[in-house]
Amino acid sequence: MKNIDDLVDSASDLAQRGLSKGEIADELNVSRETASWLVERSGTGTEPDTSDDGGPHDIHVDWSAVGRDSNRLYHAGAAMADLLSKKGDDVDLTIGIEKAGAPLATTVARELETDLGTYAPTKHQWDDDESETSDGSFSRNFAQIRNRDCYVVDDTITSGKTMGETIDAIHEQGGNPVACVVLADKRGIGDIRGVPVYSLLQVIRVGSDGDS
């Protein structure tokens, strides 16, 4: 994807396939507000925004060149594991945030010799006309928390809300999140809920909202 029109087209396609705006945000690595704006701009949304305000301020991170190749994906995951290798003692569980965090977490878990779990965040159920009443959940097909120390893995941090939700969910299950790692951090966050966050890349928007 090279321009905003590509993103609008992709958002439109995903919306027509029945994905919620939360899922579209996850697929395009943008905030939920940006995903909503893209869908509305495409004309697929129920109430298109006709105001010409230049759109939301966000950064799109396209790491599909890594994700579509298993060898590149492995090496990216191994680099993320290296960032965590000296963070915490006796950590034996890695939690991947679905969807994109799960394959990265698989490599991290393999490299650090931990069990693997996955968490489906609330945002996958989010849409403009729905309140956020549903909870996220841990998949029963993978390892459970069971009061263990764990790492948390995702592809990008946009606002930090999803990572914070996952940390809270781990605490509710009696677990102890020791550290988080992502491919790209768009906020430059050092920690969330007191849990340190590490990233291979920090992608920071420069300029005020009034800049053209």
Swiss-Prot record:
Keywords: DNA-binding, Transcription, Transcription regulation. Residues 38-60 are annotated as: Disordered. One of its GO terms (biological process) is pyrimidine nucleobase biosynthetic process. One of its GO terms (molecular function) is DNA binding. It comes from the Archaea. The keyword Transmembrane does not apply. Belongs to the purine/pyrimidine phosphoribosyltransferase family. GfcR subfamily. This is Transcriptional regulator GfcR.
